[in-house]
Curated annotation (Swiss-Prot):
It comes from Xenopus laevis. GO terms for cellular component: nucleus. It is found in: Nucleus. This is Homeobox protein XHOX-3. Residues 168-227 bind DNA.
Length: 388
């Protein structure tokens, strides 16, 4: 009996060594270990091993089948290898192998149920984005699909940023002509609209109140840009200024008619009487204080020096076209028609000037004058420092 127990201990120790060695080396085959072969060679040397050999062989085959099944199911990297404790009997060893294989199988299926593939993540994120309009990053996967879950997380992060960009995107409102005309009329009446008035406009125009508010903000900025463009440092070419004003009035951007031959903002500094203003302009009442082009006042303290902007009824004289001492006039109107003769120049020009009221040291300093330097001598193009 002692010899039989000793032989069983040898067999169990060899089989446990084979199991641990093969689990550490991740071998797919359960047979072929040199230690198992040595233990098999030791079996026939025992005189009492003959009668019990079939039983031992059956137990060995059962254990080896359990080992092979356990190793095939334990390919997941989450399998934890613990140091085995040698049992007292081979039956307990076989039952332990079966329990470990069943535990590994259950863990493996649990991991499959928990983990998610990148296709799963992208499909879930797309579904959430289209159904609920919100994007959320999925939870991290199990260590089995660690790299895949990280890739899926990156894709979901990209879709999250794209979703945020779509939510922040603002679409431009297409206004109808009737809506724009009504808003322009209201803006002409008052630049800043109160909230009750905005609500009334929104109800009348079938627009959101926020859209009305944003439109008035943009319109005020546009008005500010137009003022700065016309007043810095001063209109370079009065003809261009007149053309722009006439074009704006013709296209409907100005809520009032504009006479093409009268740059009105410059006449407010020249002391024009009410009768002459009413006779020369179609306005029956002064412009409102916050008018779009009302602030186009000239920045210079002596606007009467700019002969190109003088009113014909005030400064017209028979000596037009001649400066002091008989020198030719250098105003814009005279220079623009210098090739047509003196008489035709006085009749065709929109702006007339009088050389007697113009200082001898001042000449109109505009790009249109400098571009026609061939018709003006050097002594007549003196530059005067501008007073700020």
């Amino acid at each position: 009996m002692e010899g039989r127990k000793e032989m069983l201990m040898y067999l169990e120790g060899g089989q446990l060594g084979t199991l641990v060695g093969k689990r550490m080396a991740h071998l797919s085959d359960a047979v072929g270990s040199p230690m198992a072969e040595s233990q098999d060679k030791l079996v026939p040397k025992s005189p009492r091993a003959g009668p019990i050999a079939p039983t031992d062989r059956a137990e060995e085959s059962e254990v080896e089948v359990g080992q092979a099944t356990g190793q095939q199911r334990s390919r997941s990297p989450q399998l934890r290898i613990s140091s085995p404790h040698p049992p007292a009997h081979s039956d307990s060893l076989s039952t332990k192998g079966q329990h470990s294989s069943s535990d590994t199988e259950s863990d493996f299926y649990e991991e499959i149920e928990v983990s998610c593939t990148p296709d799963c993540n992208s499909a879930a994120s797309d579904y959430q984005q289209h159904s609920a309009g919100q994007c959320s990053e999925p939870m991290g996967g199990s260590p089995v699909n660690g790299s895949d879950s990280s890739k899926g997380g990156g894709g979901s992060h990209g879709s999250f940023s794209a979703c945020a960009g779509d939510q922040m995107r603002r679409y431009r409102t297409a206004f109808t002509r009737e809506q724009i005309a009504r808003l322009e009329k209201e803006f002409y009446r008052e630049n800043y609209v109160s909230r009750p008035r905005r609500c009334e406009l929104a109800a009348a125009l079938n627009l959101p109140e926020t859209t009305i508010k944003v439109w008035f903000q943009n319109r005020r900025m546009k008005d500010k840009r137009q003022r700065l463009a016309m007043t810095w440092p001063h209109p370079a070419d009065p003809a261009f200024y007149t053309y722009m004003m006439s074009h704006a009035a013709a296209t409907g951007n100005l809520p009032y008619p504009f006479p093409s031959h009268l740059p009105l903002p410059y006449y407010s500094h020249m002391g024009i009487s009410a009768g002459s203003t009413a006779a020369a302009t179609p306005f029956s009442a002064p412009l409102r204080p916050l008018d779009t082009f009302r602030v186009l006042s000239h920045p210079y303290p002596r606007p009467d020096l700019l002969c190109a902007f003088r009113h014909p009824s005030i400064y017209a004289s028979p000596a037009h076209g001649l400066g002091s001492g008989g020198s030719p006039c250098s105003c814009l109107a005279c220079l623009s028609t210098s090739t047509n003769g003196l008489g035709q120049r006085a009749a065709a020009s929109d702006f007339t000037c009088s050389s007697t009221s113009r200082s001898d040291s001042f000449l109109t300093f505009t790009p249109s004058i400098l571009s026609k330097s061939s018709s003006v001598s050097l002594d007549q193009r003196e530059e005067v420092p501008l007073t700020r």
